[in-house]
């Protein structure tokens, strides 16, 4: 058995994540040769990663998307050389896994010698064509998905396939790639009399979804022995999921991978944190944690108190709220260092007197310029003092005097305080969340949803300053999404990346 693997890779910086090398390590066990085709850049780190598996690495101009990457690899061998292989596998870095050995799939498909080409999974097509552009059909045909497709020797030797690739036009866009290659390849060659199949059979899901690997990946992995899943499952726009589901596919997939497979979850987190906006994976995975007000893990809580550096940063402006602010701080472990900023020199001794008998390791009060409210104080004066700590919490006294009736603002503060620091056990449980999850960077309370704040929730957390913020970001040349954080939060100063 001689099997060639063609692996297509694109990443804007040319960096190769560990999930890719994990995939290639298993794939390579089933190959005689591997060629990697990179569109655009390949960093030194990326080249070293691929060099574990092959010396045949092609770096080409970022043109033609995946189609021309595959064409480049095929052209580099030539049809005579390609005809020496029993199978040619074309796959790419949009897949993650495997959760079971790929050998199972290769062995099972090799038993069917009637096939000319085969793949991992199928798209069941659509009665209309959702893609704009150069349609070959007025509907979307059933097709093998291009993330994993295999050609048999007799298919490679056939002039029809050779002419198809020799005459492939330049691909100008993703839509062009779908219309000219992925969505039509299977039908075009089926119509010519060639036989095909897929490893993951989903005919029973035709009425359920046209895209089983994205919409019900857990079912495919658990019940249909699918070895691979889509990276896109975690990065897909939630709005697109909500057209067909309640958003549960990605959450179910994550839970299944974590609880029922040996797949290293670090591989997912490292890639998501490096390449995705936190807003997206937080929303897609519904990363909301409910923290109990009674200690759940005494051993971990004690370890944190003994071995971790804990800080509480506070910005205190309202002296008539000193008692409640002190009560908040009193819920933190005695090993805590407290850093307080305030807006005037006359407030400093009041705060120092109020906090003098607090059972904590230290209290430091600093007078700061009265600009930027609590945010300016935190970013400019408090945050630099927290870098040597493992865990830190930030809060400020909250009155919201601009709201009417005053109960609206008071309840804002209640929501924040109750969720951040209900009692001493609650604080320890929050810190335990960080201790158990090295990738967790920030925990913050939910939006207040009462009174006028209800509309802020409906607008994604923004109030009247949304347009001002958009203008500021445009002036600064910022293009990325904003990460909206409440001004009460816990943070871990050193996280895994």
Indicate where each model-derived feature is located.
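ER/Golgi luminal nucleotide-sugar-dependent glycosyltransferases, focusing on the catalytic module
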Residues: 1-497
């Amino acid at each position: 058995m001689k099997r060639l693997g063609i692996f297509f890779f694109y990443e804007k910086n040319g960096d190769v994540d560990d999930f890719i090398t994990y995939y290639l390590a298993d794939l390579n066990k089933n190959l005689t040769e591997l060629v990697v085709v990179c569109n655009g850049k390949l960093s030194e780190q990326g080249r070293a990663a691929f060099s574990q598996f092959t010396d045949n690495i092609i770096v080409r101009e970022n043109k033609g998307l995946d189609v021309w990457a595959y064409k480049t690899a095929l052209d580099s061998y030539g049809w005579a050389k390609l005809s020496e292989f029993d199978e040619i596998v074309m796959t790419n870095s949009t897949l993650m896994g495997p959760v079971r050995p790929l050998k199972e799939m290769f062995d099972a498909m090799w038993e069917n010698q009637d096939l000319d080409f085969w793949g991992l999974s199928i798209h069941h097509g659509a009665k209309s064509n959702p893609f704009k552009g150069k349609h070959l059909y007025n509907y979307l045909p059933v097709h093998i998905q291009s993330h994993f497709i295999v050609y048999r020797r007799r298919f490679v030797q056939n002039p029809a396939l050779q002419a198809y690739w020799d005459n492939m036009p330049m691909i100008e866009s993703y839509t062009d790639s779908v219309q000219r290659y992925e969505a039509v390849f299977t039908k075009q060659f089926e119509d010519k009399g060639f036989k095909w199949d897929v490893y993951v059979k989903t005919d029973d899901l035709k009425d359920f979804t046209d895209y089983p690997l994205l919409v019900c990946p857990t079912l495919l992995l658990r019940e249909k022995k699918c070895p691979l899943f889509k990276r896109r499952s975690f990065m897909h726009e939630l709005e697109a999921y909500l057209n067909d589901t309640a958003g549960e596919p990605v959450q179910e997939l994550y839970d299944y991978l974590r609880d029922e497979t040996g797949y290293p979850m670090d591989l997912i987190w490292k890639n998501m944190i490096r390449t995705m906006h936190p807003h997206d994976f937080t929303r897609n995975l519904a990363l909301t944690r409910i923290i109990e007000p009674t200690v759940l893990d005494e051993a971990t809580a004690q370890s944190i108190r003994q071995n971790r550096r804990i800080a509480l940063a506070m910005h205190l402006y309202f002296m008539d709220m000193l008692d409640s602010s002190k009560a908040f701080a009193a819920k933190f472990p005695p090993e805590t260092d407290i850093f307080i900023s305030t807006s005037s020199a006359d407030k400093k001794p009041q705060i120092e007197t109020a906090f003098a008998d607090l059972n904590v390791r230290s209290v430091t009060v600093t007078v700061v310029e009265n600009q930027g409210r609590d945010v300016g104080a935190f970013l400019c004066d408090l945050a630099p003092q927290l870098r040597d700590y493992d865990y830190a919490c930030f809060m400020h006294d909250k009155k919201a005097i601009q709201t009417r009736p005053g109960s609206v603002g008071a309840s804002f503060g209640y929501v924040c305080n109750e969720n951040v620091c209900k009692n001493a056990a609650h604080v320890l449980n929050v810190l335990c969340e960080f201790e158990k999850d090295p990738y967790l960077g920030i925990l913050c309370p939910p939006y207040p949803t009462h009174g006028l704040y209800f509309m802020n929730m409906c607008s994604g957390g923004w109030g009247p300053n949304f347009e001002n913020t958009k203008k500021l970001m445009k002036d600064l040349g910022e293009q990325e999404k904003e990460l909206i954080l409440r001004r009460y939060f816990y943070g871990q100063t050193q996280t895994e990346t």
